[in-house]
């Protein structure tokens, strides 16, 4: 036991040492927040309903593998959703065992590997069905699939009508395929008016009833709830729900209630000041000289820019936190640096910590606020944070893992 404790302390020390080297920029991901978000969402759905954690786009920028590993042993977790086979393959390579569903189109080149790895593709094209069936024969293993139904999104999926019913029948004629699930996706569930979402739900439920009554097929996993529906549409729970942005503690929109399920944002973003100087009236800052000082102004340079995914559209609009106070951005955000006004913050020095996302004392910068200021939205902000930013993972206050993309280039 003593040896194990020493090993653990040694590993923690190495991780802390590694994190200390990230002076330019780093993101911290609070795994406890993600765990709590999952538990709170589960409390708001039916006891028998499972959760599918959507961890596409590398877990919305948070890191898909560490999150999947943490959630792997939760009994109410059905599995994970990815956008591409490559994302699913990375999870399998990392030892993730639970089911993985690919939400979009899966290209034929990977069908055999997909079946071997028991990754579930969405199906809605006849050629996909035929090619998957052929691949299943070659591999000697059934391909489990989820049928995608378009009830109003207008993106991908079969129509919930006679033609769609014929497609389901077509799948049933291929013994190499096993229909594990069927799903649709709401277009407007994050709006206060749920008329459209309820109409989609009705179409989906009616179509499922037709599949059962006319084809005699009982599909085990029926799902349509996304993050917004988990919060506000309990009637849409079904067998499983898909937790996307809410997994990471962000709400789908400003119209969705924040009182039903408490969520805690998991990501923070930090840097350090690399240069401080005073400029005088008439001097400009950054490209284009969009900011010109009207008086003596104390300027701090932050070594982060749009090359890291920090939006250029925050130029002259955004702010950071230093010593628990707001420091507004001066002029344009550059590819690798931007400048802030620290005139009203006493004692600012080179090397001081800077909060770009998250809390510092009583002040907080949220992804929602940054999304609004930059003309984007919260999903986009966290998803587009670049690979130059290492991710540091904390559990119970301790660093448990560090993901440095430069080590894998």
Report the location of each language-model feature.
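Active-site-proximal beta-alpha core segment in soluble small-molecule metabolic enzymes
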Residues: 21, 25-28, 33-36, 43, ...
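Active-site anion/phosphate-binding pocket segments in diverse small-molecule metabolic enzymes
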Residues: 2-35, 86-87, 106, 124-132, ...
């Amino acid at each position: 036991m003593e040896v194990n404790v020493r090993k653990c302390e040694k590993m923690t020390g190495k991780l802390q040492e590694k994190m200390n080297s990230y002076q330019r920029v780093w993101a911290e991901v609070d795994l406890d927040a993600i765990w709590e978000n999952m538990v709170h969402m589960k409390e708001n759905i039916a006891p028998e309903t499972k959760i599918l954690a959507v961890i596409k786009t590398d877990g919305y920028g948070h890191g898909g593998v560490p999150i999947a590993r943490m959630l792997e042993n939760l009994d109410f977790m059905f599995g994970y959703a990815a956008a591409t086979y490559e994302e699913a393959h990375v999870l399998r390579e990392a030892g993730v065992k639970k089911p993985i569903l690919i939400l979009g189109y899966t290209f034929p080149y990977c069908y055999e590997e997909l079946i071997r790895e028991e990754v579930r593709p969405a199906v809605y094209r006849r050629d996909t069905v035929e090619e998957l069936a052929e691949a299943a024969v070659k591999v000697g293993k059934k391909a489990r699939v989820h049928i995608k139904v378009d009830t109003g999104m207008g993106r991908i999926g079969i129509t919930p009508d006679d033609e769609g019913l014929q497609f389901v029948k077509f799948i049933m004629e291929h013994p190499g395929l096993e229909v594990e699930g069927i799903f649709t996706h709401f277009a407007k569930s994050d709006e206060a008016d749920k008329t459209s979402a309820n109409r989609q739900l009705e179409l989906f439920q009616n179509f499922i009833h037709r599949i059962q009554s006319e084809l005699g097929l009982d599909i085990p996993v029926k799902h349509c709830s996304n993050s917004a529906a988990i919060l506000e549409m309990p009637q849409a729970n079904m067998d499983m729900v898909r937790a996307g942005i809410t997994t990471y503690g962000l709400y789908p929109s400003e119209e969705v209630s924040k009182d039903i399920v408490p969520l805690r944002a998991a990501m923070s973003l930090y840097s350090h000041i690399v240069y401080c100087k005073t400029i005088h009236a008439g001097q400009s800052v950054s490209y284009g000289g969009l900011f010109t000082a009207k008086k003596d102004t104390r300027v701090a340079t932050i070594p982060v820019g749009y090359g890291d995914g920090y939006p250029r559209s925050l130029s002259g609009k955004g702010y950071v936190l230093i010593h628990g106070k707001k420091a507004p951005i001066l002029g344009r955000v550059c590819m690798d640096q931007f400048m802030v006004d620290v005139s009203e913050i006493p004692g600012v020095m080179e090397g001081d910590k800077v909060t770009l996302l998250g809390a510092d004392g009583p002040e907080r910068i949220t992804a929602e606020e940054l999304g609004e200021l930059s003309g984007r939205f919260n999903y986009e902000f966290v998803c587009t944070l670049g690979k130059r930013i290492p991710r540091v993972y904390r559990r119970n206050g301790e660093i448990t893992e560090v993901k440095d993309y430069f080590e894998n280039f």
